[in-house]
């Protein structure tokens, strides 16, 4: 979503410039449901589509950009909450790739998820993860943890802050009400789209 917003909608590749005027993290009243291709886990609704919510005549480009970043983070939080419901408590996560280079994106994500993020040295997460799993399968390492301990290097750590995590927790509660309110609408529109 972040790349789509920047490149396809704003027609820029200068991500840093677009982020420099975003200043009031945790207080944006514009929401974005990032369901550009439906939504997978944990909602599993192929008819869901992206929506901006809460815009007014005063809404700025910066608020919309911030809403896109926050919406992606809130959608990831949906998956973290699903894991919690299964008894899995996630306290830290690695981040990599283009988005991980942005201090603002890491700050939003760390505080929305309320976990420590470690930016990894290797930017090719999926391919590198596949190589790690292959190394374990071939017997080079006894388990995934051992392989990761040896191969994955952290270059930056981003910690949540209590104040910002609280603001984002409140915003996540509001975000969580939007999709259920639109579920029937998504379904009806999907029937007419097919």
Segments and roles (model prediction):
Residues 1-194:
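Active-site core segments that coordinate phosphate-bearing ligands/cofactors
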């Amino acid at each position: 979503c972040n790349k789509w917003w920047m490149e396809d909608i704003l027609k820029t590749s200068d991500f840093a410039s677009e982020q420099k005027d975003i200043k009031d993290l945790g207080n944006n009243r514009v929401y974005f449901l990032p369901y550009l291709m439906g939504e997978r886990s944990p909602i599993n609704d192929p008819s869901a589509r992206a929506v901006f919510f809460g815009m007014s005549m005063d809404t700025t480009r910066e608020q919309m950009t911030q809403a896109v970043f926050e919406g992606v983070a809130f959608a990831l939080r949906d998956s973290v909450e699903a894991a919690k419901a299964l008894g899995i408590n996630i306290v830290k996560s690695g981040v990599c790739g283009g988005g991980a280079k942005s201090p603002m994106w890491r700050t939003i994500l760390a505080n929305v998820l309320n976990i420590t993020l470690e930016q990894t040295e290797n930017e090719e997460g999926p391919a590198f993860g596949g190589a790690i799993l292959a190394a374990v399968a071939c017997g080079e390492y006894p388990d995934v943890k051992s392989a990761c301990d040896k191969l994955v290097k952290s270059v930056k750590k981003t910690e949540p802050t209590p104040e910002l995590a609280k603001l984002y927790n409140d915003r996540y509660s509001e975000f969580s009400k939007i999709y259920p309110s639109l579920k029937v609408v998504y379904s009806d529109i999907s029937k007419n789209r097919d």
